Amino acid sequence: MSFDFIKDKNKHIHFIGIGGISMSGLAEILLYNNFSISGSDMNSSPITEKLKDKGAKIYIGHKKENVKDADLIVYTAAIASDNPEIIEAKEKNIKLMDRADFLGNLMKGYKYNIAISGTHGKTTTTSMLSHVALKANVDPTILVGGNLDIINGNVRVGESDFFITEACEYKSSFLKFFPYIGVILNIDADHLDYYKDLDDIKNAFSKFIKLIPKDGYLVAYGEDKNIQSIIKEANCNVITYGINSGDIQAHNIEYDEKACGNFDVFKDNQKLFSVKLNVPGKHNILNSLASICIGLASDMKDKDIIEGIESFFGTHRRFELKGCKNNITVIDDYAHHPTEISATLDAAKKYPHNKMFCVFQPHTYSRTLTLFDDFTKCFDNADEIILADIYAAREKDTGIINSNMLGDKLRERGLKCTNFHKFDDIKNYLIENAKDGDLILTIGAGDIYKVGEMYINL
């Protein structure tokens, strides 16, 4: 690991938006290496409390006074240019670096950077691969976009040349990385508040491919038509995977009573080994194939790959079993894009239940608006849909789109759908209507998980 780009280990580094999952991970890596760290966020959280316990100075709220001792400021793409800490940094000539730049510079200190990109599945695949790498004893540094039990959080600092991280395409952040193994799980229309259209997104992924050195590897889902159209841009080793085609394939797929896949792994029409997943759905078969490809490209042993895959039981907020109440199961999932919702509901359909209640909180006004038609078609596997208000995240309500409009379209299509403004009202509705053997599935990238927790903790 090298921090040459920081120049001086005595420097004080301040993070604006330190409570974010990636920012907190970077801060934790620096704390581990004895840097002086501070950070600000709008709200206190378990993440900020954990960083405080590790020695970081945490400020709640953004104020210019927060940066007075900083030598370097790291900020997220969600931070606006009129943020008082950004303004103060510019006035005081304090060096500014966005999160992606900082992470990219950090990656320069490693030889085997594994950057996992794609519209969907990054956190799960990064987590699954982390299990494989730890079983293989490669002692990786890991930065993942979720909490992973095996590393007791979202970051692990290793001593080897292996660095495993997610590579998010939002605002082309991943183009600042230095992948030795670049992974593309899928390409779909998303972040249309930044990208013009799907072609613009594909162009960004095409540039990502070109970052991989000639002796490196592109691992890609070969059955994704959007990936197929850009894979020719690769000037490196290419490994494709899929169900029906690709260098690495899953054959003889069977699902157990919890919708988890068991299958044989084939390479060039020769069976390598069999795997039994402990996470549900076809999408996780594909995620596991990506992890297997990376393991094989990294010369990891088959037994370590198998043990790593089979020891993975999921990450927090990814088809996470929250508990049972009166024989009613509550599961939470981070899905917030129509494709992800469809995959989650498809997995849930195979899960044992009588009636499925899907409690969905749309995430951001821009995504709800630009993908509105797709949102009206992704809930068909749910028996009943409950919609919360849109979670604004980094955006402001312009009055153009709201959750009731989505509910109206779903009802027009003949789906049973009810809108609520308050989580308490959703909880009370579930108390009255969910029966023995039913499944409650909370879905969304905001705070909709709280509904499931409220229900469980009655």
From Swiss-Prot:
Coiled coil: none annotated. It catalyses: UDP-N-acetyl-alpha-D-muramate + L-alanine + ATP = UDP-N-acetyl-alpha-D-muramoyl-L-alanine + ADP + phosphate + H(+). ATP binds at residues 118-124. SUPFAM superfamilies: MurCD N-terminal domain (SSF51984), MurD-like peptide ligases, catalytic domain (SSF53623), MurD-like peptide ligases, peptide-binding domain (SSF53244). Keywords: ATP-binding, Cell cycle, Cell division, Cell shape, Cell wall biogenesis/degradation, Cytoplasm, Ligase, Nucleotide-binding, Peptidoglycan synthesis. One of its GO terms (cellular component) is cytoplasm. Pfam families: Mur_ligase, Mur_ligase_C, Mur_ligase_M. It comes from the Bacteria. GO terms for molecular function: ATP binding; UDP-N-acetylmuramate-L-alanine ligase activity. This is UDP-N-acetylmuramate--L-alanine ligase. GO terms for biological process: cell division; cell wall organization; peptidoglycan biosynthetic process; regulation of cell shape. The keyword Lipid biosynthesis does not apply. Belongs to the MurCDEF family. Its EC number is 6.3.2.8. It is found in: Cytoplasm. Pathway: Cell wall biogenesis; peptidoglycan biosynthesis. The gene is murC. Cell wall formation.
